[in-house]
């Protein structure tokens, strides 16, 4: 199964993620591809991590990218 990670920053980040998750076609595609990753909310400067690898989308808000990466299980290589 393909896994894709994408990163979005800027003021439109939340809107972009909403479009991805609210659009039925894209949501189906996201479930199929198991999207996960994080983006910076340009309005609050919070880091939002999202993980759909379990079949439904889990999201958490963090202060730092490092916290988001830890939640997602990234390993620095």
Language-model region placement:
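N-terminal non-globular leader segments, chiefly Sec-dependent signal peptides
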Residues: 3-13
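Acidic, low-complexity, intrinsically disordered interaction modules
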Residues: 14-66
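Glycine-centered secondary-structure boundary/capping sites
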Residues: 5-6, 18, 24, 73
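Short intrinsically disordered terminal tails
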Residues: 1-4, 66, 70-77
């Amino acid at each position: 199964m393909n896994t894709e990670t994408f990163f979005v920053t800027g003021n439109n980040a939340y809107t972009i993620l909403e479009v991805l998750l609210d659009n039925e076609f894209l949501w189906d595609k996201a479930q199929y591809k198991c999207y996960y990753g994080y983006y910076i909310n340009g309005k609050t400067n919070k880091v939002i991590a999202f993980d759909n690898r379990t079949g439904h989308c889990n999201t958490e808000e963090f202060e730092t990218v490092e916290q988001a990466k830890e939640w997602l299980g990234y390993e620095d290589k």
